[in-house]
Regions:
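Active-site HxH/HxHxD metal-binding segment of metal-dependent hydrolases
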Residues: 1-66
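Short beta->alpha connector loops
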Residues: 8-11, 78-81, 153
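Residue-level detector of flexible, active-site-proximal loop/helix-junction positions
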Residues: 34, 81, 177
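Catalytic core of the metallo-beta-lactamase
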Residues: 43-126, 157-158, 164
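Short active-site segment of divalent metal-dependent hydrolases/proteases
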Residues: 11, 102, 177
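Cap/insert and terminal regions of metallo-dependent hydrolase folds
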Residues: 16-17, 21, 105-107, 111-198
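A general structural motif
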Residues: 1, 24, 91, 166-168
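Active-site neighborhood of phospho(di)ester-bond hydrolases with catalytic His/Asp-centered motifs
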Residues: 2-8, 28-30, 96-98, 149-150, ...
Length: 198
């Protein structure tokens, strides 16, 4: 294992555990995360050094290593509220992302659990999940009105760049892997951002 990547400013809790298991691995993360971890009071969150930190003003020129850069395309979505690092594993055409968008419900995660033992979401969880599906306009609205609100021009530019990549599969942190019509689903979810308007 050569790299430990925090997919955004929220997905970092187990970096210390991974660094202990793989002490020579380089830690990669978004702007603000090293400082957030330094200020943390949780004993499980260490003070490890980051080898590469993606920043808005240098995101196109940031290099991890020649080997990494040859196989992986990176887009730092600084316009996203969580400061997303989106990866394209070029050899297999796989897009990997944390919170750029969700694909709920997460049926794969519970595929080995009996119906009787599956969690039963309450009203709030059902409402949240309904806005985190790739079908319909709920997630589109959330992305447009809330998630990208802080810097929509930069968010749009990032989404447009990701859309130009050649991928067939999307691996989200939240929800099922998208193995069919990945480009079409991406274009539908981000339609307004790709056009730059609603």
């Amino acid at each position: 294992m050569q790299y430990i990547i925090a997919g955004d400013i929220e997905h970092h809790i187990f970096i210390s555990d991974w660094k202990t298991a793989f002490p020579t691995a380089k830690i990669i993360g978004p702007d603000g995360l090293p400082e957030k971890r330094q200020a943390a009071t949780d004993d499980k969150i260490g003070k490890e050094e980051f080898a590469v930190v993606y920043k808005a003003d240098t995101k196109r020129s940031t290099s991890v290593s020649p080997e990494f850069d040859a196989d992986i395309e990176v887009e730092y979505v600084d316009g996203h509220a969580n400061k997303e690092i989106v990866l394209l594993y070029k050899p297999d055409k796989v897009l990997i992302q944390a919170d750029l968008f969700f694909n709920l419900p997460a049926t794969e995660a519970y595929s080995r659990v009996s119906e009787a033992d599956k969690p039963k979401p309450g009203l709030l969880a059902r409402t949240f999940m309904s806005a985190q599906k790739v079908e319909g306009n709920g997630q589109k609205r959330l992305l447009w009105h809330a998630i990208s609100r802080g810097n929509r021009p930069s968010f749009n530019e990032s989404v447009q760049r990701i859309d130009s990549w050649d991928f067939n599969i999307i691996v989200p942190c939240h929800g099922d892997v998208i193995e069919s019509n990945a480009k079409g689903i991406f274009a539908r979810v981000f339609e307004w951002h790709l056009k730059g308007r609603k």
